[in-house]
Amino acid sequence: MNSISEIRNFDLEAEVERLYSADLPYHNFQHAIDTMDAAEHITARCLEEGIRVEHRVVYYSLLFHDAGFSEENLALGFETKEAYSADLAADKLQQIGVGRKIIEKVVAAILSTHKDASFVTVEQKAVRAADLSGLAATYDIFRENTANLKIEHEDFIGESLTWPEWVSNANKTIRFYFSQEIRLTSYFVNEHGESAFRQAVRENLERLVAESDETGDSISLR
């Protein structure tokens, strides 16, 4: 199989959707679908550039990568949300007869989406790149995602943040991700200058910060 679309399992997706909370404005099932759409382009580019990729690993990883996000992972015995999602993936994939080696690769790829994780294999890089693809989306989508993540964060911590405070936090987080180059296709790495991905992320972030500096608390989140 040479594309994500060729291997999508809509019956499985309907089951996995139940592991996502529709109440979350960002980490809902649509986010998983969006990352799979991004992976379609990423893996196609890999093939164009002679980079071999296991599409099934990428597909399963992205399908499950934020499953159970609304649950209290620590109370369930998992150090991170990614570890819980990976466990849910392993259980379900084993139930439907997916081989052990594929499951191990899926678990590793899901764990590689953690902020501080390393990403070494092509599949891990593709999954992390797809998960972060929204950073390089159009500015309207990027800004909407930023606002939705603010809502989620406030719900989780039980406190409200001003928009400038949130933008400051987002700036630090995104710059951290920005510092970690995803050495995959030419879209993500350019030996002769800034890659198209990094340029798009930088421009989105600079505009977000500039707007926040200009308008402060009065900025509209919708």
Range-by-range predicted roles:
Residues 1-71:
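Acidic/His-rich, divalent-metal-binding segments that scaffold phosphate/diphosphate chemistry
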Residues 11, 15-16, 58-64, 106-114, ...:
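Short alpha-helical scaffolding segments that buttress acidic/His motifs in well-ordered protein cores
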Residues 25-52, 64, 115-222:
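Divalent metal-dependent phosphate-bond-processing catalytic cores, especially two-metal-ion Mg2+/Mn2+ enzymes
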Residues 35-39, 79-96:
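An active-site-proximal "capping" alpha-helix that borders the catalytic cofactor pocket
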Residues 42, 70, 88-96, 109-116:
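Mid-sequence acidic-hydrophobic segments that form the walls
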Residues 49-57, 96-113, 123:
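Acidic/histidine metal-binding catalytic segments
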Residues 73-79:
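Metal-dependent catalytic cores of enzymes that make or break cyclic nucleotides
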